[in-house]
Regions:
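C-terminal effector modules of nucleic-acid-centric enzymes and ribosome-associated factors
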Residues: 31, 67-70, 214-217, 363-487
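Helix-rich terminal scaffold detector
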Residues: 44, 52, 62-87, 148-153, ...
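Long, basic/Gly/Ser/Thr-rich N-terminal segments
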Residues: 2-36
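Conserved catalytic-core segments of large NTP-driven translation/proteostasis enzymes
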Residues: 48-51, 60, 229-400
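Conserved Switch II/interswitch segment of TRAFAC-class P-loop GTPases
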Residues: 148-149, 155-160, 170-192, 202-221
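P-loop NTPase switch module centered on the Walker A-proximal segment
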Residues: 20, 27, 31-163, 172
């Protein structure tokens, strides 16, 4: 029976008694025996992190090294495009299947290849994450060259799920902006999603003009002109506009081509690791015998550093509760990494980029039902402080962009008010936050009380939204200047 001893250990116990236990050579061979068509990883590859890149063959064989977001208005084809490229249906929850829309962040990996013999766009192919590194071209029989291994972060487009979209934006390296050609452009969440990724300093945006199978050529040209006018003056002004039908996989090769030509993100492999948790779950099926229980799993992405199988890690903030006086108290979690996976691919280590599942030796109850969403994982004692409040240099948008008619009769975004409650996105978590102080010459330095507390890094970009009706609407962004009370 698994004993979840790490829950009861203090930081001193972990650092004093528990050490990293790397797997043996025999264990490594056993780990990779199920996927012999992929590269065998070795700790020697990462012994000098300054010499590795996101395109290092041993890394790219098993792990995605870029995160691509799919953004845009509801029902414009984001999930369908991800399925057309990766072969994976990202809507897996019951409510999503019943209503045929995305409610939660969806995830899928894809390997992107080029055939050295096939002409033009026909040379570009996409397969699942478990495909071998040099498969034969189905058209000509030549061996394909692996160019990229990417993870899709499929964001919901419904207006009431804007906070979920912002959580996904925190881990994106680039974005596909889906625009349905059979609707007037822009739609409300087309505007709002583009504004969100711009605020998060995302530079690489590809515009995809979807559903061209539903309209005639003249209508497609008119919609194209609307898209050009909409993108003018934004970070997407020079972005390619790719006409496709995701449903029929028409011109998908063009999307793959542009994905393969995105700039390689600059990664920090040297600093202590910082892993952003965007989901957590219990992988045990109901009725599993106690001796067969597996520990909890967290999923997310590394923004810097490297994590290895067998390492001791800390999760902050861990268990959050309130004392008798109503004040928040936090018990950070410590555990050993017992598995690293990306979809079905086993990993010996994980590097920045791509979505990773980290198996831990903690009670699976703690990770069930997304209980650890928004947490940070890393080496003990190396993570940012937990703050009960933060001070932010704010930048307000001039108007609400996520409401109907915002282009013609847009509502002005009013100034932030004392005691107002806004929704702040810090990393991958959304926090209801009360304004407790406003200062600065332009009244743009705001202190927020976080409820509950969260990890934040000085200089980190945060987004904030205001409640309008039943939905949170994006109103601005800012940089964390300082933390307030630590916990």
């Amino acid at each position: 029976m698994i004993k979840y001893i790490y829950l009861k250990m203090t930081e001193k116990d972990i650092l004093g008694k528990e050490k990293t236990i790397l797997p043996s050579e025999e264990e490594i061979q056993q780990l990779f025996s199920k996927s012999k068509n992929l590269a065998i990883q070795s700790f020697s590859t990462i012994s000098d992190p300054s010499k590795i890149t996101p395109l290092t063959p041993e890394i790219m064989s098993r792990q995605a090294t870029m995160n691509i977001g799919t953004i845009g208005h509801v029902a414009h084809g984001k999930t369908t495009l991800v399925r057309a490229i990766s072969g994976i249906q990202t809507t897996k929850h019951k409510i999503e299947k019943e209503r045929n829309i995305t409610y939660y962040l969806g995830y899928a990996n894809a390997k992107l290849y080029k055939c050295p013999k096939c002409p033009d766009l026909d040379a570009y192919k996409a397969y699942g994450s478990g495909m071998e590194d040099s498969p034969k071209c189905e058209t000509c029989g030549e061996k394909l060259e692996l160019l990229r291994h990417i993870s899709f972060v499929d964001c919901p487009g419904h207006d009431i799920l804007m906070a979920t979209m912002l959580n996904g934006a925190s881990v994106m390296d680039a974005a596909l902006l889906l625009i349905a050609s059979n609707m007037e452009c822009p739609q409300p969440q087309t505007r709002e999603h583009l504004a969100a990724v711009e605020n998060m300093d995302l530079e690489n945006i590809i515009i995809v003009q979807n559903k061209i199978d539903l309209i005639k050529e003249d209508a497609a040209k008119e919609n194209y002109n609307q898209i050009k006018a909409f993108a003018k003056g934004t970070k997407a002004a020079k972005s390619p506009i790719i006409p496709i039908s995701a449903q029929y996989k028409y011109n998908i090769e063009a999307v793959i081509y542009y994905l393969c030509n995105l700039p390689i993100p600059k990664r920090d492999f040297v600093s202590p690791p910082r892993f952003i948790v965007i989901r957590s779950f219990d992988i045990n099926k109901p009725g599993t015998e106690a001796e067969n229980l597996q520990g909890g799993v967290v999923g997310g992405t590394l923004v810097r550093g490297i994590i290895r199988l067998g390492e001791i890690v800390e999760i902050k903030p861990g268990i959050i509760s309130k004392n008798e006086e109503g004040k928040y108290i936090v018990q950070n979690l410590y555990s050993r990494i017992v598995s690293l996976k990306t979809e079905t691919n086993d990993l010996l280590y994980a590097v920045p980029g791509g979505l990773i599942g980290v198996g831990l030796k903690v009670d699976p109850f703690l990770t069930s039902k997304s209980k650890l969403n928004g947490r940070i994982l890393g080496h003990p004692g190396k993570l940012p402080d937990i703050y009960a409040s933060i001070v932010v240099k704010t930048h307000l948008m001039s108007r609400y962009v996520g409401t109907k008619g915002a282009d013609k009769n847009s509502s002005h975004v009013g100034e932030i008010k004392f005691k107002e409650v806004l929704l702040i996105n810090v990393g991958s978590t959304s926090i209801a936050s009360e304004v407790v102080d406003i200062s600065g010459e332009n009244r743009d330095v705001v202190k927020f009380r976080l409820s509950p507390p969260a990890c934040a890094e000085i200089g980190e970009t945060v987004a904030f939204s205001r409640k309008l009706g039943h939905s949170w609407r994006l109103i601005g962004w800012g940089k964390v200047l300082e933390g307030g009370e630590t916990i």
